[in-house]
Regions:
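Structured surface interface patches that mediate subunit assembly and partner/cofactor docking
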Residues: 2-23, 28-41, 61-92, 98, ...
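N-terminal interaction modules that seed assembly of large macromolecular complexes
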Residues: 39-52
Length: 223
């Protein structure tokens, strides 16, 4: 059975995450480090912050594409990532560096712009979720997924990039609801298995003494 969260998601969890992350995005430590390199090599702290708030911005935008285009197939989460060019590309490949460079450029508006994007998206998100249909169109991959699966993808991205931002300025990751983190972690486990194979992912998660190397869902894939 393909991984899906359809019918199981707390659809208010993403909104609560937006509220919980506002202090981090607006933190003076983030402002002071805005143009410095982040915990992600080659990407500025500002770029990471802009990428983080962009997850909420994209949620509002994509949930509002109603109805989804008729030509777009409805796919599973695994198929969504199979269609994603950056997923298996090396971190220094254009598929990944273009994302880094785009968000570094978008961060030129400074911290105040990212704070405003987050505030605006936070205000609009509840209505966007309430009005969403059963599936949501993802223009980047020209396909649709169940709306609950779409929200889990955004939750996972939020969790990962919130940690990136916090680590970049030596702040703790803000507490986020289990309703957001548990589905996000489940998705990351499956994506790790897709990247590295089930045995590698399994051992990294369950048996450190048999772990054969890194099993991150994103990043370099062992040769």
């Amino acid at each position: 059975v393909p991984l899906t969260f359809a019918g199981t998601v707390d659809r208010t969890a993403l909104h609560r995450a937006a509220l919980a992350l506002a202090p981090l995005v607006g933190a003076p430590e983030v402002a002071a480090a805005w143009d410095r390199e982040s915990a992600l090599p080659g990407m500025t702290v500002g770029g990471v912050a802009r990428h983080l708030v962009g997850q909420f911005e994209a949620a509002v935008e994509f949930l509002g594409i109603l109805p989804p285009p008729s030509h777009a197939p409805v796919v599973t989460l695994v198929e969504l990532y199979r269609r994603t060019d950056w997923f298996t590309a090396p971190v220094d490949a254009p598929e990944n560096t273009s994302i880094r460079d785009d968000f570094d450029a978008m961060a030129a508006g400074g911290q105040a712009d990212s704070v405003a994007v987050l505030a605006r998206s936070t205000a609009w998100l509840p209505d966007a979720v309430a009005a969403a249909g059963p599936t949501t169109y993802v223009p980047w991959q020209d396909c649709s997924v169940s709306t609950d699966d779409f929200l889990v993808v955004r939750a996972m991205e939020v969790l990962v990039h919130a940690d990136d931002l916090a680590a970049s300025v030596q702040l703790p990751l803000p507490d986020l609801d289990d309703e957001l983190t548990h589905p996000a972690l489940a998705l990351l486990a499956v994506l790790s298995a897709r990247q590295h194979g089930t045995p590698t992912a399994l051992r990294a998660l369950a048996r450190a003494e048999r772990a054969t190397g890194p099993a991150a869902a994103f990043g370099p894939v062992a040769g």
